């Protein structure tokens, strides 16, 4: 990320974070059967939904635009963008709760799913400012179940308090769930002068060198820890990682 403001200003801004103005068993009664333990899913068979939930910082739409470009370069064709800044991204859908749910549920013919959400967050979920809504963990889990079922599924939630998405229901064997912060922590880099959030910057920087989602998760977390330390952040965000047993070796598209 290119820090466009003086270091002291960036440090003071970071103190406010990105809040709005392990393997655990799956819940009983839910079928988790999978034909095989997946590793390499062809890039053309991924269904990707990239969501920028707030428009008071350019970092969120920058994040989905940059990840779209990386996925496209790897051969992913089924990419849906949802934005809270329709002036900037006029071809993208507005990030409303209903549009997010519809995009996630429409994975017909896919062999793997990716949901990437970057925004401000609260302990209730991720903010969708343009639609005055919130994506809650239960709603995300329901949409993923309906659209992706037992397909290999990667969920990246980049927001303050995003660790709230690591619920027992979300921790399914076919899912990788990465969050930018623990449930009781804020994340950083969402000011007006930031190009990317800290977490998004690190994920994008580490993307090309990683082979599996697990490798990318570990490298991204280490990058965030180093970046926060260099910026003098006193209360680190503590990015969280869950990799389900059925997708331990799931490779990035095109790797």
Residues of each region from the PLM?
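Structural recognition of the beta-strand scaffold that forms the well-ordered cores
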Residues: 47-51, 79-83, 113-118, 153-158, ...
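Solvent-exposed loop/turn segments at secondary-structure junctions
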Residues: 54-58, 78, 85-89, 119-125, ...
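Caspase-like cysteine protease fold
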Residues: 26-34, 39-41, 209-255
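Active-site-proximal C-terminal subdomain of hydrolase catalytic domains
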Residues: 154, 159-238
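A short, glycine/acidic-enriched catalytic loop
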Residues: 119-149
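Bacterial N-terminal signal peptides
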Residues: 5-15
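Extracytoplasmic/secreted proteins, especially bacterial periplasmic and envelope-associated proteins
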Residues: 59-66, 70, 95, 99-102, ...
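Boundary/activation segment at the start of structured domains
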Residues: 4, 18-110, 191-195, 248-255
């Amino acid at each position: 990320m290119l820090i466009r403001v003086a270091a002291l200003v960036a440090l003071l801004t970071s103190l406010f974070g990105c809040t709005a103005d392990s393997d655990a068993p799956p819940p009983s009664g839910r079928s988790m059967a999978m034909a095989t333990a997946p590793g390499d899913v062809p890039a053309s068979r991924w269904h990707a939904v990239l969501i920028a939930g707030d428009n008071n910082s350019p970092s969120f739409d920058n994040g989905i635009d940059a990840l779209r470009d990386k996925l496209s370069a790897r051969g992913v064709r089924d990419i849906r963008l949802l934005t809270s800044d329709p002036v900037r991204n006029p071809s993208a859908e507005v990030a409303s709760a209903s549009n997010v749910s519809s995009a996630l549920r429409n994975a017909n013919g896919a062999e793997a799913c990716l949901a990437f959400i970057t925004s401000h967050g609260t302990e209730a979920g991720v903010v969708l400012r343009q639609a005055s809504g919130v994506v809650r963990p239960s709603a995300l889990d329901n949409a993923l179940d309906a659209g992706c079922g037992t397909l290999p599924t990667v969920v990246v939630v980049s927001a303050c308090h995003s660790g709230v998405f690591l619920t027992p229901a979300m921790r399914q064997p076919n899912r990788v769930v990465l969050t930018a912060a623990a449930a009781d922590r804020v994340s950083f880099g969402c000011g007006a002068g930031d190009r990317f959030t800290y977490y998004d910057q690190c994920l994008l920087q580490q993307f090309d060198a990683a082979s599996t989602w697990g490798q990318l998760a570990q490298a991204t977390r280490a990058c965030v820890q180093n970046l926060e330390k260099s910026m003098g952040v006193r209360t680190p965000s503590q990015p969280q990682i869950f990799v389900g047993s059925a997708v331990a070796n799931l490779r990035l598209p095109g790797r």
